[in-house]
Amino acid sequence: MNSSTLRRLLPVAILLAGLAIFLLLGLERYFSFEMLARHKATLTAWVAAHRLLAGLTFVLAYAIMVAFSLPVAVVATPVGGFLFGTWIGACLSVAAATLGSIAVFLAARYAFRDLFRARASAMLARLEEGFRHNDFSYLLFLRLIPIFPFWLINIVPALLGMQLKRYALATLLGIVPASIVYAGVGAGLGAVLKRGEQPDLGIIFEWHILLPLLGLAVLALLPILFARLRRQPSA
């Protein structure tokens, strides 16, 4: 492996090393609702006294969680809602998750796109052609429906040649609905923790939440459907 290849793999290696260190040291225990319940008075007092700094710190910490694909990012948006309220917490979470996703996207594109193209050029060419025509709608759909792993959706568009600004905008718009839901859950977290209970993060799969998300996802796919209909030869 030459120095050029090593240099290209370095960003991804750093992200993977960070994830490995996090898991090996068992640091996930510090990012739990139990830990939040233990320190909520200190946290809320600090946020109230340093609102701007607290917001920036939250965004930075959350973005790092997403960039390193840490398995604790799911608690970050509810914590944002708890500390900052539903709407500010959702806005900060969207900004942070978008920034972290961009970091993964850039690392994957820098490290793997040429290698992926060399190993699977014919397949990639077909996928890339279809994805390029409808990349924004495809990615928006994937972001709206919380089915696929977040880290996987961060990587695939990079390998398929999606433009960064289109990726960033589709990511930002696509994660807004779920972020509002989870931040809303977090806004009521104080009472839940006081009762010694855990918040229900599965709420997003309840029908009164999931159906509107499915509706938005269908709307995101409409441009793809219309494009295919236009390409079909008329009888």
Each PLM stretch: what is its role?
Residues 166-172, 188-189:
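Membrane-embedded alpha-helical hairpins and interfacial helices in multi-pass inner-membrane proteins
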Residues 2, 6, 15, 21-59, ...:
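Membrane-interfacial helix-loop-helix
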Residues 10-19, 170, 214-217:
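Hydrophobic alpha-helical membrane-interfacial segments at the cytosolic entry of transmembrane helices
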Residues 81, 96-100, 145, 158, ...:
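Transmembrane alpha-helical core residues of multi-pass small-molecule transporters
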Residues 60, 64, 91, 95-99, ...:
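Hydrophobic residues within alpha-helical transmembrane segments
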Residues 23-29, 68-69, 76, 81, ...:
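Juxtamembrane "helix exit" motif at the C-terminal ends of alpha-helical transmembrane segments
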Residues 206-219:
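Small-residue-rich transmembrane alpha-helices that serve as helix-helix interface/gating elements
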Residues 62-91, 147-154, 165, 178-181:
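Transmembrane helix boundary and interhelical junction motifs in multipass membrane proteins
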